[in-house]
Amino acid sequence: FANRWGGVFTTMQNYLYFYIPLLTMSLVSKELSSGSIRLLYSSPITNTQIIVGKFFSMMIYGLIMIGILFLITLCSWAVVKDFELSMVLTGLLGLYLLICAYAAIGIFMSSLTSYQIVAAIGTFAVLMVLSMIGGWWQEYDFIRDVTYWLSMPGRSGKFIAGLICSEDVLYFVIVVCLFLSLTIIRLNSVRQKIRFVITLGRNIGVIFLACFLGYLSALPQMKLYHDATSTKINTLTPNSQDIVAKLDGGMTITTYINALDPGSSWFAAPYFLKPDMERFEQYLRFKPDMKLKYVY
């Protein structure tokens, strides 16, 4: 299930990337192109109810998809000795959260145009940006934290590996709320003829709030973890935890770099600070005040 080179969940992630945008491209754009959106506007329901209703339909559809995988899980649990049920269930949770995030993004892009193909292409473009943004502007401290948090790759991978982190859970929740809010703002601006400047200000405010909450959730001191594997493969051994617990005060890991070596010096550039921190994530879990320092 969790094999990164062809496991069921890993393959499912790749399919979702292409399937969900095609599924959501008509949720709002078809209403706009056919004119049926006017019927919704004239009915006694708010734009929030319209969008939340469409999102709930995608959530239910996602549950059906996950339910099929759950049946496969039950069959495997019944015939495989020492089956890692809790780990596989954690992977299912990660896939479901990924479906919800993709659906929210797709609904937003569908609300921007009456052309379904354009909505699908726009969704692919947003997903591509979220896949690449983790490597942008890594030279600046605060921006590095925000852009790296916005990056989507690997989020559901941690669930598939059996590790639940509060940062990843909040990431999906914040992304869903962000794009649903942007969709509601978009429909309100059309329905109520709101000025462009006001709509732009609301969009910027929502995006800023989402980035700020994401920045807080990514702080090591704010993270909570649960290792669902039976062998606790994602957690330090008890002996290692005892050693880390005995370290009083802060801890700084200093890396000395030979800047004249073109083959390895670039690994210590600010661009690689976040990947470096991920290597020590198991230690950061028990020593959140640990810092990295580079000497050139």
Positions of predicted regions on the chain:
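Terminal transmembrane helical anchor/hairpin motif
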Residues: 1-6, 112, 119-191
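Secretory targeting signals
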Residues: 2-13, 52-116
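Long, hydrophobic alpha-helical segments
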Residues: 7-30
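Hydrophobic cores of alpha-helical transmembrane segments in multi-pass inner/ER membrane proteins
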Residues: 16-22, 99-104, 169-184
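Transmembrane helix boundary and interhelical loop/hinge segments in multi-pass membrane proteins
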Residues: 23-41, 55
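Internal/C-terminal transmembrane anchor helices
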Residues: 195-221
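Juxtamembrane extramembrane loops of integral membrane proteins
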Residues: 219-296
